[in-house]
């Protein structure tokens, strides 16, 4: 059987998945959803003799803690932590495709997914055109409430994530040339 424990601040998609699975002709208890604090529930899962394996996606800090709790019990573990996914754009790349992939990879899901493109490595021969095209593309992204019609990018999931985003922007300003934005937006809707 499977126990799904989503991030405590963003359980909606896990609830929707559970509702879909519940409508299937599956044995009771095959799929289980637990919502709550990761520190409490994670430790219970990690130390339970009834749970032989864990798959974890999240931060390095939380992953280390989970591993420390689970390893004495010789559990099988699969961990994907602190992703920093690069996107490589070569000189012979199809420019519109590369720009679209970069924008979707970096900004899709407000960049809050483990598969987000955290860095883009661009060869010198295509660099200028790529930056110009990407800047134009992202300037057209409609930022708004996540459920607002036409909104393409919603808010950060919490204040801590928002502050982390701002910190990365400041690092970028110090270590590179800013091409677009760089300041928090003044939005009329709640969120971060």
Question: Residue locations for each model-derived region?
Answer:
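Beta-loop-alpha module in the N-terminal Rossmann-like domain of NAD(P)-dependent dehydrogenases
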Residues: 38-44, 58-65
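ALDH superfamily catalytic-core signature
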Residues: 47, 53, 61-192
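Short beta->alpha connector loops at strand-helix junctions that form conserved
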Residues: 5-7, 35, 90-91
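Conserved beta-strand segments of alpha/beta enzyme cores
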Residues: 29-32, 177
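Conserved small-residue-rich beta-alpha loop and adjacent elements
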Residues: 1-28, 52, 96
